[in-house]
């Protein structure tokens, strides 16, 4: 099993390799390998298990009634997926989780995580705290995305998102965690329209950009002195 991925996971924050190994049986841990393109979790079905990526990567996708697929997220070693659905247990998944390459996933039983073991060990309590923190962080990330995709125009969406990134960096010069296609998907716009608007914004003197690096001339320098950790 990939100890590095387990140690990097927010679920096991603060735990040693030995402590994690001792906790896994209590959490109903079950590893499984998937081939590229194989469906890990299917929309329309419930799950009591959350997944932790050990090797490779997985995609979280939504398919509409016409068959159009929208990429909602990507999970890499150490990342969790489907934890909110697993904790709700009776909620049907609205998304598919698909292996983007050969991967190994560790499934964890949400009911066994949320129910204290008979020894009421400190390690189990830490896992619950870490899970709540992870759920809160992902909820805030969804709230930020809703804020950035709320404006009607592409320019307004870009200014909203890039303004936040400048604030997080504590500088007018910053690098975003997306390439151009990923940024278009995140803001829910067409890539060509996004590229055209960025070109217009550069001509208007609002910013300069190269790939994922930006320098804003339109926003005031952030007043805080400590950069905000980027959770996107």
Model regions: which residues?
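Cyclic nucleotide-binding regulatory module and flanking cytosolic helices
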Residues: 1-36, 85-88
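Short, small/polar residue-rich loop motifs at catalytic or cofactor-binding pockets
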Residues: 26-27, 45-47
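Glycine- and acidic-residue-biased ligand/ion/polar-headgroup-sensing regions
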Residues: 37, 48-61, 76-78
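Short phosphate-coordinating micro-motif centered on Lys-Gly-acidic
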Residues: 39-45
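Cyclic-nucleotide recognition modules
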Residues: 71-129
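Short, Lys/Arg-enriched, Trp-marked, Pro/Gly-tolerant hinge/linker segments that flank
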Residues: 122, 142-154, 167-173
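Long, hydrophobic or amphipathic alpha-helical segments
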Residues: 125-128, 132-142
